[in-house]
Curated annotation (Swiss-Prot):
Residues that bear Phosphoserine: S724
UniProt key word Cell wall biogenesis/degradation: no
EC number assigned by the record: 2.7.11.1
Entries under Pfam families matching the protein: LRR_1 (PF00560), Malectin_like (PF12819), PK_Tyr_Ser-Thr (PF07714)
Keywords annotated in UniProt: ATP-binding, Glycoprotein, Kinase, Leucine-rich repeat, Membrane, Nucleotide-binding, Phosphoprotein, Receptor, Repeat, Serine/threonine-protein kinase, Signal, Transferase, Transmembrane, Transmembrane helix
Residues where ATP binds: L572, G573, K574, G575, G576, F577, G578, T579, V580, K593
Protein name (record): Probable LRR receptor-like serine/threonine-protein kinase At1g51880
Membrane-protein topology: Single-pass type I membrane protein
């Protein structure tokens, strides 16, 4: 048995002086010596031939320092200097990269008494707005190295040092190494490095340039292990790029009849592990020799069965699901089978801890805008303006207010830059803050024109430009129109004359009447002030609402409807509500649903849908652009969904390609997320009441959004689990318990969604009188008794799906349509299960075909006995 300790405890040894190595391509490497001066300085570390540069171009705060000479002698040069952060609570490095790229991130901390205090600080490090870990050093002369594998969600990465009240944060070096995007796959979260080991008598560790990704491999050896090696080259041409020095050595148990066992313990008992194992047969076997073994963990839980390593070719095995343990302790066993004449072996082992990043990043365009505003007006001295502008909420930038919609990115809704000595013109970057309600640029030295883009910021209600004596107060026509319609308040200086542009002419107007006008709208300002106070106090309880919505702002007249639809020229579809037309509103495509005068859905349902969509916003709910309530003319104007509804796409009515299994799984999880938001993210919660495939719409990328909320009902907030109501919905999708009792609950939606899931996987009608079992629920249940899932899956899929995932989703659907609502899962549980199905399909597509040729295997589905289910 071999106990594996966190290799990061030993990584600091990788920074001691070693023999020089040959340089290789460092394409994509970012290697920062933190505190190196001057800012354009670079050098090549002679022991690794890695080129380091100053960090000054990646951060605009902090002080530079140097560790004491007594600690430098045996350390590599990038640890000799530090950057410390005595000012501000959070200080951040900024990297412009590419979204969805995968990086190995390494941060090094060597205190070395750089400040002469001999007091080791404690602080946190964040990745974006989420905490990575706490930095704790064992002593003045000791260092720490942290590693993470992270997939970028935006084109920008921020790494932040955060105070915890226990000293001043600092950092010695920061390194980013690009990885292949089809490696280190996870269901969710990032990976914190725990161990990366190889098995050889020498050397003690391996890194660049033997490892082209500059991963640090620490030698693991001791009692119970025997090292074997080869001088022959091993084929390492799989995406993990295992170094030859790792591939050409391996360990076997000293006692050939005993298993190999590796133990490790995570400090948090709730943490999960991902394990990546690298195998190659590096001994020349005799004709009657067999090396075959099983891999299990924690007392027999199967990981992989009957493994035979490829001869002189590396295979990388990993599980698409993380390993878990009730107490944080893990034991990985390699045991030879009864057929094997040779003991198990392993060449390299990587262990990671899962880190779920809980904080959502602010909208990428708004982050870019704020960073550009900061640069334009030289606001680097604003100590709070570090990292993500809105997240986490406790580090929101000074002068900003943000909205925090549930399950969606934070958005900036007010910006106050009053009295900040701003000079120059008003930057167009402000126009990118599309959710802005209030803007205060007063008491600065701004000049130039009042920009017309203010008129296009539809949610903007208040602009304060007073106290900017150099600003030309000519008001553009487009802004004047908004002032006249009272949809915008503009405050200018009380001591200057403003120019109002009327009918193409400039006219000087004394400021006294303007001041009177401002006084006339003072009550509106008071209302706005109360609004912001209430919003701040109730931000958490109203995560599902958007405080920027002003109802009449979304109201559209009937002549405007005629114009946007070109007199109802193009029909998109027809339904019980009426006809849906294609339209264009300000160069944006929209769908216009006109209420038929003979429609069964009356004004009450129309009003209910408008009120719901005006306050509910989620990426998987169809957004309301506006509505028309003009006499007898009622219309809803939605965002345009280019690929129509799910039922059309399943039936082939729209033509085009058959929806793949991958498409279907993603559509299912996105629709489920929208429904789960209605149940758990809204205040009060909502029940949709009409979930069906025609109410799941698909955009141009086949992203799914839930639509048609005319039958939706509020859910009690006083602890009651249901309401009594008249039965409404669509036959076939209607919860039989609700139909029988008139008691409506969230589980009624769950039932309907279960029917949708069965449609997605079978492509069969919900009811079919030609079947012995007319309803799809009964038909699927009867077919499954034969134990052959292929007989119920859509034949158009041509067998191109993950069988294990198919079983999982069918069983989930049948649980949803259980006749008893108490035995149905919640939508939160449904979302979790569907995400696992998506992960299985992703692993299959990125795995089985590629892995067969590239030499690595996703072993979560490799045991035929475990992942080819028969009758259940």
């Amino acid at each position: 048995m071999k106990s594996i300790h966190g290799f990061l405890l030993f990584l600091i040894t990788a920074y001691v002086i070693l023999e020089s190595v040959q340089a290789q391509d460092q394409l994509g490497f970012i290697s920062l010596d933190c505190g190196l001066v001057p800012k354009n300085a670079t050098y090549t570390e002679k022991t690794t031939n890695i080129t380091y540069k100053s960090d000054a171009n990646y951060i605009d705060s902090g002080l530079v320092g140097r560790i004491s000479a007594e600690y430098k002698a045996q350390l590599q040069q990038q640890t000799w200097t530090v950057r410390s952060f005595p000012e501000g609570e959070r200080n951040c490095y900024n990297f412009n990269l590419t979204a969805k790229s995968r990086y190995l991130i390494r941060a090094t901390f060597t205190y070395g008494n750089y400040d002469g205090l001999r007091q080791v600080p404690k602080f946190d490090i964040h990745i974006g707005p989420s905490k990575w870990t706490s930095v704790k050093l064992d002593g003045v002369g000791n260092g720490a190295v942290l590693e993470m594998i992270h997939v970028l969600t935006q084109d920008r990465l921020q790494i932040c040092l955060v105070k915890t009240g226990k000293g001043i944060p600092f950092i010695s070096s920061l390194e980013l190494r690009p990885l292949n995007n089809n490696t280190y796959l996870t269901q969710s979260g990032s990976l914190i490095g725990f161990a990366r080991v190889f098995f050889s008598a020498t050397p003690t560790f391996i890194r660049y340039d033997e490892d082209i990704h500059d991963r640090v491999w620490v030698r693991q050896f001791g009692n119970g292990l025997k090292s074997i090696s080869t001088d022959l080259l091993v084929d390492t041409s799989n995406p993990y790029d295992v170094p030859q020095a790792v591939a050409k050595t391996a360990c076997v148990p000293s006692n050939a009849s005993q298993p190999l066992i590796f133990d490790w313990t995570l400090d948090n008992i709730t943490s999960q592990s991902y394990v990546y194992m690298h195998f190659a047969e590096i001994q020349t076997l005799k004709d009657n020799d067999i090396r075959e073994f099983n891999i299990t963990y924690n007392g027999g839980q199967n990981v992989y069965s009957y493994l035979r390593p490829e001869k002189f070719e590396i295979s990388t095995l990993f599980d698409s699901k993380p390993l878990s343990s009730p107490d944080g302790s893990f034991s990985l066993s390699f045991t030879k089978t009864g057929n094997s004449t040779l003991p198990p072996l392993i060449n390299g082992l990587e262990i990671y801890k899962v880190l779920d990043l809980l904080e959502l990043e602010t909208d990428q365009d708004e982050v870019s805008a704020m960073i550009n505003i900061k640069a334009t007006y030289d606001l680097s001295k604003k100590v709070s303006w570090q990292g993500d502008p809105c997240a986490p909420k406790s580090y929101q930038w000074e002068g900003l207010n943000c909205s925090y919609p549930n399950s969606d990115q934070p958005r900036i809704i007010s910006l106050n830059l009053a009295e900040n000595k701003l000079t120059g013109t008003i930057t167009p970057e402000i126009s990118k803050l599309t959710q802005l309600i209030e803007l205060d640029l007063s008491k600065n030295d701004l000049s130039g024109e009042i920009p017309e883009f203010f008129a296009d910021m539809k949610l903007l209600k208040l602009i304060n430009l007073s106290g900017n004596l150099g600003l030309n107060s000519t008001i553009p026509d487009s802004i004047q129109q908004r002032l006249d319609s009272k949809s915008l308040i503009l405050i200018l200086s009380k001591t200057v004359t403003k120019t109002v542009t009327l009918k193409g002419k400039s006219k000087k107007v004394p400021m006294i009447p303007i001041v009177a006008s401002v006084a006339g709208v003072f009550a509106l300002l008071v209302i706005l002030a109360i609004f912001f106070v209430v919003r701040r106090k109730n931000g958490e309880s109203n995560k599902g609402t958007n405080p920027s919505i002003i109802t009449k702002e979304r109201r559209i007249t009937y002549p405007e409807v005629l114009k946007m639809t070109n007199n109802f020229e193009r029909v998109l579809g027809k339904g019980g509500f009426g006809t849906v037309y294609h339209g264009n509103l300000e160069d944006t495509q929209v769908a216009v649903k006109m209420l038929s005068h003979s429609s069964a859905q009356g004004y009450k349902e129309f009003k209910a849908e408008v009120e719901l969509l005006l306050r509910v916003h989620h990426r998987n709910l169809v957004g309301l652009v506006g509505y028309c309530d003009d006499g007898d003319n009622l219309a809803l104007i939605y965002e345009y969904m280019a690929n129509g509804d799910l039922k059309e796409n399943m039936s082939g009515k729209r033509g085009g390609n058959v929806l793949t299994w991958e498409n279907r799984m993603q559509i299912a999880v996105e629709a489920a997320q929208g429904l789960e938001y209605l149940h758990n993210g809204c205040t009060p919660p909502m029940v949709h009441r009409d979930v069906k495939t025609t109410n799941i719409l698909l955009n141009e990328r086949y992203g799914a959004k839930l639509a048609d909320f005319g039958l939706s009902r509020s859910f009690p907030v006083d602890g009651e689990s249901h309401v009594s109501t008249v039965v409404a919905g669509t036959p076939g999708y209607l919860d039989p318990e609700y139909y029988r009792t008139n008691w409506l609950s969230e589980k009624s939606d769950v039932y309907s969604f279960g029917v949708v899931l069965l449609e997605i996987v079978t492509n069969q009608p919900v009811t079919d009188k030609t079947r012995e079992r007319t309803h799809i629920n009964e038909w699927v249940g009867s077919m499954l008794t034969k134990g052959d899932i292929k007989s119920i899956l859509d034949p158009k899929l041509m067998g191109d799906y993950d069988t294990n995932g198919a079983w999982k989703i069918v069983e989930l659907a049948l649980a949803c349509v259980n006749p008893s609502s108490n035995r149905r899962p919640t939508m939160a549980h449904v979302v979790t299960e569907l995400n696992e199905c998506v992960a299985l399909e992703n692993a299959r597509r990125q795995g089985r075909e590629e892995m067969h040729t590239s030499g690595y295997v996703d072993f979560s589905r490799s045991s035929a006995s475990e992942f080819s289910p028969g009758a259940r």
